[in-house]
Amino acid sequence: CIYVEALMNRTPWRLWNFWKGIPNPKGSALEAMTILENAFEVFPSAWKHAGLLHMYIHLMEMSPHPEKALKHGDILTDLVPDAGHLVHMATHIDVLCGDYHNVLSRNLLAARVDDKFKSYAGAENFYALYRIHNLHFAMYGAMFLGQKGAALEAVSRLRKEVPDEVVHLY
């Protein structure tokens, strides 16, 4: 898992040439994909490894075939139920494949998990950006579903997470 993450970090957020649908020639997307897909094929326990599932989702989300990671996201959503970020991760693929119901429901679930962490650790820490990210995804999914109430609720919660100084600055 750490080796694959290192390969992916050679060209962070540029693993694929999105417009051409090919791997970035300066990166290691194909090598990372081969390693991860081999792990899932050869080692059944890989399907219970949150790190491997997480890396595969990030690897495939800007690839020409994000749908290859749908199963990985479905499994990861329930694997670590007290980690809001991992509950949310499947929606990086769901949104690309048009599954807005899962985008909304999984991010609302992630937001509930995030609330538990916020109660424990407070609001002002590195995880604040993850809470905002999950609520933004929930709002996006709700809008694509035409669920005005859910979208407004998500944006209301989102606004409470973003300090006034940030809102006024941007």
Q: Predicted segment positions?
A:
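A conserved active-site cap/scaffold subdomain adjacent to cofactor or substrate pockets
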Residues: 137, 143-151
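Acidic, glycine-rich loop-and-beta core segments that form the ion-binding/anion-interacting portion
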Residues: 103-117
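TPR-repeat structural position
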Residues: 29, 65-66, 100, 148
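Active-site-adjacent "gating/activation" loops or surface patches in catalytic cores
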Residues: 48-50
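Short coil/linker segments at helix-helix boundaries
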Residues: 2-44, 53-63, 72-75, 80-82, ...
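Beta-sheet-rich non-transmembrane sensory/scaffold domains
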Residues: 109, 153-157
